[in-house]
A protein has these predicted regions:
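Hydrophobic beta-strand scaffold residues
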Residues: 104-105
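Phosphate/diphosphate-binding loops
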Residues: 80-96
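Short low-complexity, flexible loop/linker segments enriched in glycine and/or proline
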Residues: 70, 97-98, 117-122
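Hydrophobic helix-and-loop "lid/oligomerization" segment in the mid-to-C-terminal part
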Residues: 1-80, 99-101, 149-280
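Short alpha-helices
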Residues: 37, 115-170
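Short, ordered loop/turn segments at secondary-structure junctions
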Residues: 26-27, 58-60, 86-87, 109-112, ...
Length: 280
């Protein structure tokens, strides 16, 4: 992938200086899983302080940077924007933000006419030597961390292949490429994300024809979870909330992917004023 090593070096420079990272979340399942993979890798693997990662959940279906320019602080000095699954062709926004002092890293899979002159763009569609044009945004950010681990050592990226599989299936990526096939086969047999595990358990009757009392953890690793099952019984739940949920519900959805054990006010009948973990 073009610019991938430069992108890793750019991120490392900002992490080494404990700079603020601004993370716009694209409003679809691929966008949520992409941002969640990035956030979780930084926090869980690299132990980056959570207060240094500032994310933005859009209220509607707006994509890219044009509608959130005022969300970024005016002074971008020593700050990095990481735009995943969007923004390859936001050339004017890149120029404006660069003039304000920001460094910009774009990790994307959408078509674009050219590389931005004011951002480091990693895009499989623009990379002539990278053959997998069917990777979605979460697939490209996974390849980013594969490269990161080859440069700075590590073996943790594959632990997030469940999120990659979910995002690629939800974005209806073709599975005729060997890379996508491997990602989905491995990811669906290694379900590690707690929120995704909970969703699968709650949908076990639709997925496996069993009730929750018959469900056990073997289903996360024994090949029972299929691409069709994810596409029909998991993805629609996530997409529906992203489309029609209120801002708090969308925030809770992303939090479930990244911080499943935080306490939030209970919404259960008879538990007003009480708290529960976000992934109960």
């Amino acid at each position: 992938l073009d610019n991938i090593k430069e992108g890793c070096k750019l991120l490392k420079e900002h992490l080494d200086n404990f700079n603020e990272i601004y993370l716009p979340v694209d409003p679809d399942c691929d966008g949520y899983t992409s941002a969640a993979l990035f956030y979780n890798y930084l926090v869980d693997v690299l132990h980056y302080p959570i207060e240094k990662i500032i994310y933005h959940i859009p209220e509607g279906k707006e994509h890219g940077l044009s509608t959130i320019m005022n969300w970024f602080p005016e002074d971008g000095t020593n700050r990095l924007i990481v735009a995943i699954d969007s923004s390859s062709n936001d050339y004017e926004e890149h120029r404006s933000l660069s003039n304000r002092g920001y460094d910009i890293l774009v990790v994307d899979h959408h078509e674009a006419s050219k590389y931005s002159e004011n951002a480091t763009v990693i895009n499989n569609q623009l990379s002539e030597k990278y053959m997998n044009k069917m990777a979605s945004g979460v697939g490209v950010i996974y390849k980013f961390f594969e490269c990161w681990e080859s440069m700075y050592n590590g073996q943790s990226a594959q632990n997030y292949l469940d999120l990659v599989a979910l995002g690629e299936i939800s974005d209806v990526m073709q599975m005729t490429t060997s890379e996508n096939r491997y990602i989905c086969d491995y990811g669906l047999n290694h379900i590690n994300n707690k929120f995704l595990r909970n969703l699968i358990k709650k949908q076990c009757y639709s997925l496996f024809g069993i009730t929750e009392d018959k469900f056990n953890n073997n289903y996360y690793t024994n090949g029972s979870i299929t691409q069709i099952g994810i596409a029909f019984y998991i993805t629609p739940l996530i997409n529906a909330l992203i489309r029609v949920g209120n801002p708090l519900e969308k925030e809770r959805l992303f939090q479930a992917f990244i911080t499943p054990d935080i306490l939030v006010p209970s919404t259960k009948r008879g538990e007003k004023g009480m708290e529960e973990t976000i992934c109960t």
